[in-house]
């Protein structure tokens, strides 16, 4: 299956056929929820927290105006005023576009789609900014810089770097172009060093045999018991009240 546009890339068929960083992370969080998403039985709702990042992404892609035309409700309240989410996204955009270094790292080929084989299965990736022979940069809009490590972006960097190398572009360094949603936007370029990327790829390799077997229907997925999907399909059980008192 070829993936030449967003419709194909994000299709249910593509998610069944390919692995991606987001799908791998889904399996790490909850195998049952990840399996349900692949089967089309569960769809994780988009949150307001994700919207600001999406708007900034679309500006760098050059498709923000298209989104405004297609979904005006994202931008405007019923009274015609700009929504707070878009106002914040607009602040971030105006701030980072005045910074030469930030814009240079985001000046590569936008949303480049890669397809390759790794660990015996097909993978897909879409790069925010690809500078051939120079670097891979991923745009991140986060609450603050401390939250960057929480989201484990080294996993994303490891997969993207491996994909770029497998597609014949060589091994390139991986950077995060990060901006915050704080009252006064903070922004910087973070390089994830090679030893960290190597460890992340080794971790993925160790987990993939089980995840591949689950996706293929050869093993049963584990239910984490705490995510929204697990709560949506659970059955009541008798529990000890003292569980709630544990620190």
Please place each PLM-identified region on the residue numbering.
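Mg2+/Mn2+-dependent nuclease catalytic core
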Residues: 105-203
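Broad hydrophobic/π-residue packing in well-ordered secondary structure
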Residues: 34, 57, 139, 153, ...
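Metal-dependent nuclease catalytic cores that hydrolyze phosphodiester bonds in DNA/RNA
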Residues: 1-126, 237-238, 242-244
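Metal-dependent nuclease catalytic regions and adjoining charged, substrate-binding loops involved
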Residues: 3-5, 86, 149, 162-247
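Generic recognition of cysteine residues
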Residues: 28-30, 77, 131, 135, ...
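Short secondary-structure junctions and interdomain/linker hinges
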Residues: 62-66, 100-103, 153, 211-221
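Alpha-helix initiation/capping motif
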Residues: 30, 47, 131, 145-147, ...
């Amino acid at each position: 299956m070829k993936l030449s546009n967003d419709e194909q890339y994000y299709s249910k068929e593509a998610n069944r056929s390919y692995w991606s960083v987001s799908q791998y992370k889904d399996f790490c969080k909850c195998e049952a929820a990840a399996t349900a998403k692949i089967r089309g039985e569960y769809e994780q709702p988009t949150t307001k927290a994700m919207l600001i990042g999406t708007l900034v992404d679309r500006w760098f892609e050059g498709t923000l105006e298209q989104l405004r035309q297609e979904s005006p409700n994202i931008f405007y309240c019923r009274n015609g005023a700009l929504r707070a989410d878009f106002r914040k996204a607009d602040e971030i955009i105006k701030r980072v576009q005045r910074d030469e270094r930030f814009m240079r790292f985001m000046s590569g080929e936008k949303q480049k789609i890669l397809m390759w084989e790794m660990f015996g299965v097909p993978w897909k990736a879409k790069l925010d900014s690809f500078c051939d022979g120079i670097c891979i940069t991923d745009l991140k809009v986060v609450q603050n810089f401390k939250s960057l490590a929480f989201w484990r972006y080294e996993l994303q960097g490891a997969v993207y770097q491996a994909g770029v190398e497998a597609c014949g572009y060589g091994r390139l360094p991986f950077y995060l172009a990060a901006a915050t949603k704080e009252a006064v936007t903070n922004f910087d370029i973070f390089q994830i060093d090679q030893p960290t990327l190597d460890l992340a790829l080794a971790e993925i390799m160790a987990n993939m045999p089980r995840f591949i077997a689950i996706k293929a229907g050869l093993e049963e997925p584990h239910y984490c018991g705490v995510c929204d999907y697990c709560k949506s399909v659970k059955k009541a059980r008798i529990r000890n009240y003292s569980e709630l008192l544990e620190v």
